[in-house]
Amino acid sequence: MTYCKRGTEGLIYLEDGTLLRGCGFGAKGVRYGEVVFTTAMNGYPESMTDPSYRGQILIITHPLVGNYGVPNPIVRNGILQNFESEQIQIEGLVVTEETDPSKWNSSKSLHQWMAEQGIPGVSSVDTRLLVKKVRTLGSMMGVIASGEHVEDPRKYIEMRYDEIDFTKFTSPKSPIIHQNNSPDIIVLVDCGIKHGILEELYKTGFTIVRVPCKSSADEIMNYSPKGIVFGNGPGNPNILKDLVKNFSAVMEYKLPTLGICLGHQVATLALGGNVRKMKFGHRAINKPVTDISNNKCYISTHNHGYGVYKEDIPPDTQIWFVNPDDGVVEGLIHKRLPLITTQFHPEARPGPNDTTWVFQKFKKMVIKDEGN
């Protein structure tokens, strides 16, 4: 029997019938969600607060998690510098070993943080076995329990991940303004934005106005923006009909537009392309993407379970980036409209900053458009 240092047992269940028992940490309780994994070796506070993980149970493949604890939030200009949102977004966390922290700026342990926010965790389980299951069979629904006796985990799965519009949980209810040196406005359609994206946009010097995910084209254009950004967010893009419709309406104004992650997928759908569920997705901070225009390869951060393939791209677009590992299209450029997209996260957080220049490219598009 596994010795649990906190005296709490836990379990992780996959819908294929796999059931592993280990040690519980964090909050006591039972949660269900889509089981996914990340190969990132660090950056767990950023990953766990990334709204794109909403509705998912996250397995971290690195064997030791919690080493450097959890810092106090640092906020500048209304933007978090060391978290991607104000709360933990994942449904639960699965690790091989949950360790006690040892770092000068740690304010609390991973266990304490998760307990405070009501998120269960399970450790002392074979994460390699779980990841191999997900890689072989694909992402699947699962149940995580900490400190709770669960007879039949299957009964806790209420809905399929692909059927839920998670943006209603991650989008702001009203507009949020980040005033900057320039009065010129960039409207950011916020379906669950990472604060790393906010920070990079703020560095462009423009005032950023975050509007709710389902904002209409008229509501967006009321701000007289110089450019528009459709950011990341959780869930299945194919069920976000209103968002796709609004994207199409916004593009009629021919303003410089940047789509990131979910924004890339929504752009693809709005322009007549297809977006497919991937077998187990890309979730890592060291994924390669190749710029087709110059054959340069960059290392980038990814978090997506849906993808666009070469045969799926919309008319009048050309591939900008592609993942050389599996051929997934990681960026598009429109041939006639001032639109660029990336499936990967050019802001990283966590991850390398090889592609932060994408935001400067967008800034140049906005300035060029102003000069016309």
UniProtKB/Swiss-Prot annotation:
Residue segments, region CPSase: 1-186
Binding residues for L-glutamine: S52, G233, G235, L262, Q265, N303, G305, Y306
Domain (Glutamine amidotransferase type-1): residue spans on this chain: 185-372
Keywords noted in UniProt: Amino-acid biosynthesis, Arginine biosynthesis, ATP-binding, Glutamine amidotransferase, Ligase, Nucleotide-binding, Pyrimidine biosynthesis
UniProt catalytic activity: hydrogencarbonate + L-glutamine + 2 ATP + H2O = carbamoyl phosphate + L-glutamate + 2 ADP + phosphate + 2 H(+)
PROSITE patterns named in the record: GATASE_TYPE_1 (PS51273)
Enzyme class: ligase
GO biological process, one term: 'de novo' UMP biosynthetic process
Domain of life: Archaea
InterPro entries: Anth_synth/Amidotransfase, CarbamoylP_synth_ssu, CarbamoylP_synth_ssu_N, CarbP_synth_ssu_N_sf, Class_I_gatase-like, CPSase_GATase1, GATASE
Active site, per annotation: C261 (nucleophile), H345, E347
GO molecular function: ATP binding; carbamoyl-phosphate synthase (glutamine-hydrolyzing) activity; glutaminase activity
SMART domains reported for this sequence: CPSase_sm_chain
EC number of the protein: 6.3.5.5
Family statement drawn from the similarity comment of this UniProt entry: Belongs to the CarA family.
Quaternary organization: Composed of two chains; the small (or glutamine) chain promotes the hydrolysis of glutamine to ammonia, which is used by the large (or ammonia) chain to synthesize carbamoyl phosphate. Tetramer of heterodimers (alpha,beta)4.
HAMAP family referenced in this protein's UniProt entry, alphabetically: CPSase_S_chain (MF_01209)
Function text: Small subunit of the glutamine-dependent carbamoyl phosphate synthetase (CPSase). CPSase catalyzes the formation of carbamoyl phosphate from the ammonia moiety of glutamine, carbonate, and phosphate donated by ATP, constituting the first step of 2 biosynthetic pathways, one leading to arginine and/or urea and the other to pyrimidine nucleotides. The small subunit (glutamine amidotransferase) binds and cleaves glutamine to supply the large subunit with the substrate ammonia.
Protein name: Carbamoyl phosphate synthase small chain
Taxonomic lineage from the root: Archaea, Thermoproteota, Thermoprotei, Sulfolobales, Sulfolobaceae
